[in-house]
UniProtKB/Swiss-Prot annotation:
UniProt source species: Desulfitobacterium hafniense (strain DSM 10664 / DCB-2)
Cross-referenced Pfam families: Glyco_tran_28_C, Glyco_transf_28
PANTHER family: GLYCOSYLTRANSFERASE, UDP-N-ACETYLGLUCOSAMINE--N-ACETYLMURAMYL-(PENTAPEPTIDE) PYROPHOSPHORYL-UNDECAPRENOL N-ACETYLGLUCOSAMINE TRANSFERASE 1
Stated family: Belongs to the glycosyltransferase 28 family. MurG subfamily.
Described function: Cell wall formation. Catalyzes the transfer of a GlcNAc subunit on undecaprenyl-pyrophosphoryl-MurNAc-pentapeptide (lipid intermediate I) to form undecaprenyl-pyrophosphoryl-MurNAc-(pentapeptide)GlcNAc (lipid intermediate II).
Protein name (record): UDP-N-acetylglucosamine--N-acetylmuramyl-(pentapeptide) pyrophosphoryl-undecaprenol N-acetylglucosamine transferase
Keywords, ordered alphabetically: Cell cycle, Cell division, Cell membrane, Cell shape, Cell wall biogenesis/degradation, Glycosyltransferase, Membrane, Peptidoglycan synthesis, Transferase
Amino-acid positions noted as binding UDP-N-acetyl-alpha-D-glucosamine in the UniProt annotation, renumbered to this chain: 10-12, 124, 166, 196, 300
Organism superkingdom: Bacteria
Catalyzed reactions: di-trans,octa-cis-undecaprenyl diphospho-N-acetyl-alpha-D-muramoyl-L-alanyl-D-glutamyl-meso-2,6-diaminopimeloyl-D-alanyl-D-alanine + UDP-N-acetyl-alpha-D-glucosamine = di-trans,octa-cis-undecaprenyl diphospho-[N-acetyl-alpha-D-glucosaminyl-(1->4)]-N-acetyl-alpha-D-muramoyl-L-alanyl-D-glutamyl-meso-2,6-diaminopimeloyl-D-alanyl-D-alanine + UDP + H(+)
One term under GO cellular component: plasma membrane
Name of the gene this protein is made from: murG
Length: 369
């Protein structure tokens, strides 16, 4: 069995593609996998590091406004179509799976026009433009959120699978997670993160929350500021007279033990990327979600609203975020254990812990049909 996976531009497209590729190899160890991405994108580094074969093509995201750059990008897209055609002829795949991003467009389209079975996976509640255009050409579209179904024109092609998460998520005990971070397992724990790069607006709001929690030894805080703003954040805490080195607080540059932190957390505060939300749903964690305002097509707000609608999260927009607003939300939840419990149940009910197996089944069924 020969499979091409493609997706790029951001980690939100690349990591699901890698998970799907590895999932196929678990079920079909003799499968040959080729990942097609752009030569300049993150995937050119991440895919070989993951031990998969990589083929690079031309590609670049379309500018939002018509300009000379638009023509240059169009030229690269036509070149990518030609390069993809050569790769397909040589590799002769039984299946092509796209996870979005501009590189997936020419690869999936060319494969479909060649009559090769093709699939898409959409990570967000609001589908990306590439996946919406490609829907008419592919066999099936696998979606993460039920809310995204209304945005696709051909509903008979849609399959709700969820988004693959790390296998450790939801499978680590609270006690083990707390011990890993040197914390107690019997205290209410707040997990705050803006992702690996951090989120300046969240980091600027959190000192106010810490001021309110300074006398609460029964509440623990795990706060990953991100590498880019770590020193800046520590300086801000110092300036505001906040002693952050406490036995029940962890203010970190980067959180390498995210599955463990998720296991011992009672409330999550952070952005609303698809992978993050898939993890908090599988782990059954209520969230205070602050969508990244510059995400393409504002898809993070659509993701966050999907959880809010089902009672699994509260949403505050980045433009409205202040320290006191964030504290009001945190306080309103930590002082109402029953509400927190119901939100956790709602989050868990939305989770798809078996997402990868569902996706792999669709892949194998499509390739062998």
């Amino acid at each position: 069995m020969r499979v091409i996976v493609t997706g790029g531009g951001t980690g939100g497209h690349i990591y699901p593609a890698l998970a799907i590729a590895k999932g196929i190899l678990v079920h079909q160890p003799d499968a040959e996998i080729l990942y097609i991405g752009t030569r300049e994108g993150m995937e050119a580094r991440l895919v070989p590091e993951a031990g998969l074969e990589f083929a690079g093509v031309s590609g670049q995201g379309l500018p939002r406004k018509l300009s000379l750059e638009t023509l240059k990008v169009g030229g690269k897209s036509f070149k990518a179509l030609w390069e993809t055609k050569q790769i397909l002829k040589k590799f002769k795949p039984d299946l092509v799976v796209g996870t979005g991003g501009y590189v997936a467009g020419p690869v999936v389209l060319t494969a479909a026009l060649f009559g090769i079975p093709t699939l898409l996976h959409e990570q967000n509640a609001l589908p990306g433009i590439t996946n919406k255009i490609l829907t008419r050409f592919v066999r099936k579209v696998m979606v993460t959120f039920p809310e995204s179904i209304a945005h696709f024109g051909v509903r008979r092609k849609l399959v709700l699978t969820g988004l693959p998460v790390r296998p450790e998520i939801g499978n680590i005990s609270r006690e083990r997670g707390a011990a890993c971070l040197g914390l107690r397992s019997d205290c209410l724990t707040l997990l705050v993160t803006g992702g690996s790069r951090g989120a300046r607006s969240i980091n600027q709001a959190m000192p106010t929350v810490l001021k309110h929690l300074a006398g609460r030894k029964d509440i623990q805080v795990i706060w990953a500021t991100g590498k880019a703003t770590y020193q800046e954040t520590l300086e801000s805490l110092k300036t505001q007279g906040i002693q952050w080195q406490r036995e029940n607080w962890r203010v970190l540059e980067y959180l390498k033990d995210m599955p463990e932190a998720m296991a011992c957390a009672d409330l999550f505060v952070g952005r609303a990327g698809a992978t993050t939300l898939a993890e908090i749903m599988v782990a059954g964690k209520p969230g205070i979600l602050i969508p990244y305002p510059l995400a393409a097509e504002n898809h993070q707000e659509f993701n966050a609203r999907a959880l809010e609608k089902d009672g699994a999260a509260c949403v505050i927009l980045d433009k409205d975020l202040t320290g006191e607003n964030l504290w009001a939300l945190v306080q309103g939840l930590i002082e109402k254990p029953e509400k927190l419990r119901k939100m956790a149940q709602a989050a868990r009910s939305l989770g798809q812990p078996d997402a990868l197996n569902k996706i792999v089944k669709v892949c194998l069924d499509t390739a062998w049909k």
